[in-house]
């Protein structure tokens, strides 16, 4: 997701005016007029042409531009941005100041991000093909421009000289200045010309190798053939969707959805093992050499940039800071969960022995026997449970939880422009003062032309400007819920409910941020910290109080889930959680080790690591997951641990401050003020320590697994 910003109207109270204030700048602030006029006049022209209705007080957030408007706006963004950078580059060395070096770039960034989002988010959501194409083209142009700006030696020179002056500025401004310097140095501007060329070459090589690894996986056409008897346990609907050969065998591709179904539902051990072996062997001959070269190239890049290895290069600006700390974190959790994992495994092993005799238990049996035990231990019919979660009832329950927890209230905004007829918009207010905090859109249902994933996009970030104006945050929640043939929303599955809570946590995180700089606002925080608020909110999905609030039978919503089902869902949440956590830790450790040891043997590492972490279980015979582990290649290289990291600290926050499962307004307001409001302008560990009154701990995470063990 891409962040954004823009709007130079100061918002007061709960009745914002739609008219935009045009501010005249004089004296030292004259340079800032470039950035201000950038936001004002760009959008004035588009508003006058289209007369589209935006959110009150957010005139630079326009969500329904035509293809031509998108491309025209992209050109204006690039043109005005270039003017601001040119002006900074021309500041005389004897007149360098915060007002003419840092502030113009900060306010340009705050205002231009919302304009950029107006151009780029339609590629994910617009129902019009020409708009999606224009959006993609605009994004490519804007990305290229931003990269070129961060390679400008003339601007870097001015910023670096100003930074060296050590002028007294606020801590948040100092942090922003450091980020500006890093923007340029990430592109090698602090290196010699020879080293800079080496960085460029290595980055190109890394991109090429990463693409090749992923392409090899995408182009893999391996398939297997099974008789109906060999697929015993798979539902008829699944079999009907498989291609059938002339000799009545079913063709099974190695797509993850097919593999997951086999490993979880197939009763035949031999079939499970055959599928697991084939899946783990994918691209073994081609991708292992590619990954080896990729790891080496990333290590060389890190060394050129002054780091011991790539892991420390990747972690330098995250909560974890160093690879050593990540490995210690993973190993501590692993050792704390080992005894519980052994007990869990013995339950699975006993059931397999009863059903299949003395056939050794393999990794390929884990999913199947976890599901079998859960069927025996828990009286949960998730098909029936789905009937208790109508979309609007769940949504109103989430609003109520957040209102009681964070002291905010929601009001639907009607008669605003949207990109599709079922999009909804809401204003968020502080419950006490009535002050407008921000807005969010909901795009909840699948449709043709829409992206296929759930996320929250920041359409505009909070920011304060030198003229006293305040820019308020605007978020967009994208979900993938279904409608039936008559156009009615289908009730949510329980996993959908959890996902909606998670994503709404990001909305709250974005709206409640009050950082002065857009760079530190909303979702623009340390990646290790970003998921903590959402992981925290997920906890309420399993509390009886919440489940009663958000549930109601489809044909009679006055009938919520019964007490026993609510209690069982909480126990089910932690079933076999130790084994599941160890599996995740295994791959996190593999990712961390290959990027912190430039001489790691990819073939031997997983073979030695697997039984060590997985309480003696060896890797599936003949496989090497390194050949089909895309997370370690693109997107999470050296950072696979981050999801677990946030889950652990969210568990600590929930247990320490919200342990009874009911919304605690006092603790919620403290979390809002001490953790969400400051955003990325302060160290996340400092924020959490200040909120908890101590350093975060892993104990609550471990205890939650142990207390609800089978």
UniProtKB/Swiss-Prot annotation:
Location of the protein in the cell:
Cytoplasm
Q: Which residues form the active site?
A: 503
Chain sites annotated for binding Zn(2+): 502, 506
Keyword field contains Oxidoreductase: no
UniProt key word Protease: yes
User: Which CDD domains does the entry mention?
Assistant: M3A_TOP
Q: Keyword annotations for this protein?
A: Cytoplasm, Hydrolase, Metal-binding, Metalloprotease, Protease, Zinc
**Molecular function terms from GO:** metal ion binding; metalloendopeptidase activity
Record SUPFAM superfamilies: Metalloproteases ('zincins'), catalytic domain
What is known about what this protein does?
A: Involved in cytoplasmic peptide degradation.
Give the family per the record.
Belongs to the peptidase M3 family.
List the protein's name: Probable thimet oligopeptidase
Identify the species of origin: Arabidopsis thaliana (Mouse-ear cress)
